[in-house]
Amino acid sequence: MQETRTVPAGPGLDVGNLTQFEYLALNSPLNIADAHARQELTAGQARIIDDLPNLFLKAAELPVEEVEREAHRAYFGLLGQHSYPGDDGRVLACYSSSVAMEILARSLAGAMSSVALIHPTFDNIPDILRGVGLDLVPVAEERLGEDDLDDVLGSVGCVFVTTPNNPTGRVLSEEGLSRLAGQCAERDLVLALDTSFRGFDPAGHYDHYRVLRDSGCRWVVIEDTGKLWPTLDLKVGWLVTAADLGLPVAKIYSDILLGVSPMVLALVQRFSEDAADGGLADLHRFVAENRAVVREGLAGVPGIHFPDPHSRASVERVHVGARSALEVWSGLRDHNVYVLPCQKFHWANPPEGNSTLRIALARSAAPLREATRALRSVLLAR
C-alpha cells in the first residue's frame, strides 16, 4: 500500500521537506509546485515521441557506450560545455540528479567532516549531505566568487554551489567561478557544482569545464536533463569528475547502479538535437512569457514583490509581504492549487523564507493562468 503523506500547515508544526510538498501536488491539474517540465510538447518534440519505436530499436542495437557518448555529446554541446571529459569514463549516467547527489555525498563523507553549502538552495541537497553525517556551513549566494571567503574555506573540505541557483536563479559568473575554483585549488578543497537549471540561462552557458580544468582544483559537476523537457521524468543526471578528484565516486556509483536505460539516453540525444535546432530558444521565450503571466497576474496586489527580477530559471519567487507563505499555501490548497512555500530552501535559517513562495513556470499557459488567478484571490483575501 502506498504511504499517505500529509503536510500540516499550522504554525510551529513540522512542515516536512520540499519534495513532500511537491508530492501532494502531483495529481492536481493546477500543480505549479515542482520544477519538473510539465508543459505540452512542441511540434518537434512530439515528432520525437512519435519515433519512440525506432529510438528503442536504435538503443537496443548499438553498444551502450556509443549511445551514451552520443547523448552527452549532444547535451553538453548544446549548453556550451565543450571541454567536458567525455572520452575517459568520467561522465557517469544516473537516473536522476538526486542519485548523483547521493553518490557524491557518500564519496565526500569518507574524506571530510564538513561542507560549505550555498544558501538558500533546494533542501534535498543539505538533507542528503547531512544524511551521510556531514556538517554544513552556509554560504550566502552573493558571497560566492568573492575574495574574502577565508572564514568559510578554512573549516571545510568541499564547497558546494548550485548555479543557476534554485530558487533564486542566480548564476555564478565565469569570473566568479574562476576565482572560487582558484581558492579551492590553493586549499586543496573539492568544488562541487549542481548545474541542473543551466539550460534556462545563457549566462550559465560559458564552458565551466574549461574554467575548472584551468584552475587546477579538484571538482565534481552534477548535470540534469530533467528540468528542460516534458519527457514524463525520463531523464539523466550526469556525475562528472576531475581526473585527480581523489574520491571513490566510481566505486560508490558501481555500488548503486550499473547504468541508465540506453533508450532514455537516445531520447536525451534527440531532445538535445531538437533544442540545438531552435528548441532551446523557443523554451527561453516560453519561460519568459510564463514569468510575465505570473507577474502581470499579480500586479497591484498589496505587499507583494518579486525578489529575483533578473532570473531566467523556470521558477519564480513571490514575496507575499506580511502574509504567511504557509497560510497562503493552505488557502491555495482549498482551490486545488499547489505552490512551494520557501522556508525549507533556507535550510540554515527557515524563517527567512516565511513570506516567500516559489512558482514553477514550466507549465502550459492555461493552467498557469488559472493558478495565478487563484493565487491573486487568496492573496487579496489576506
Segments (PLM) and residue ranges:
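Conserved core segment of the aminotransferase class I/II
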Residues: D50-D51, R213, C217-A288
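Conserved glycine-rich beta-strand-loop-beta hairpin in the small C-terminal domain of fold type I
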Residues: R285-R295, H305-V320, R333
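PLP-dependent enzyme catalytic core of the Aspartate aminotransferase-like
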Residues: Q2, P85, D334-H335, A348-R382
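N-terminal small-domain helix-loop-helix segment of the aminotransferase-like
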Residues: T6-V99, I103, A381-R382
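Conserved core of the PLP fold type I
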Residues: K58-E186, R198-V220, A325, L368
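Short strand-turn motif at the edge of the Rossmann-like AdoMet-binding core
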Residues: T195-F197, D224-T225
